[in-house]
Amino acid sequence: MKIGLSKSIINHAGFVYDAVDQGWYNTLKGHNLFFIPNTLNQDFNVMANDLDSLILTGGEYAEQRSEVEQALVNKMTEHNKPVVGIAESAFYIAGLLGGELEYIEKHFDINHPIFYHREVLEVNSHHDKCIKSLPNSANVLCLDYLGNVEAFTHGNLAGIVWNPEKMEKPWIPPEIAYMLRI
């Protein structure tokens, strides 16, 4: 599978870099990875046609990155291909669907339990937001201990609020792994 991965924008020593967490190499082992440049000067239609799926990786908000991701998400949905948002990008996908987001306290740089069907799993949290609700048409897969949405699908769109690439044993809900064909 050819999986597109968006990249964070890092400012360091007066220079601007695109970057991706190296944990994705292990998480997506055996797949062809294509890293999306943070520039609008590219053909998103051709890119969407070439990719099998797209992962919007986590990371801090940057306007340029956001514009690139929006352009590619639009083309991926036109091509009926899966798009999965991770962490901050899960909030973006939830917002597209009309989900309700809120700030949450004591949820930054911690591990916490989530509920997947009848299983309790531990995941990480590197954010101070939560998804309070999604439209009824969304399929909620995981909830945290406060009842906030931690993973969901909606057609070819999905979100995972934690960072699977930062886990010792990366875990992606099977429904989303199936969408990505991983």
What do these predicted ranges mean?
Residues 1-88, 95-102, 107-120, 128, ...:
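N-terminal beta1-alpha1 cap of cysteine-dependent amidohydrolase-like domains
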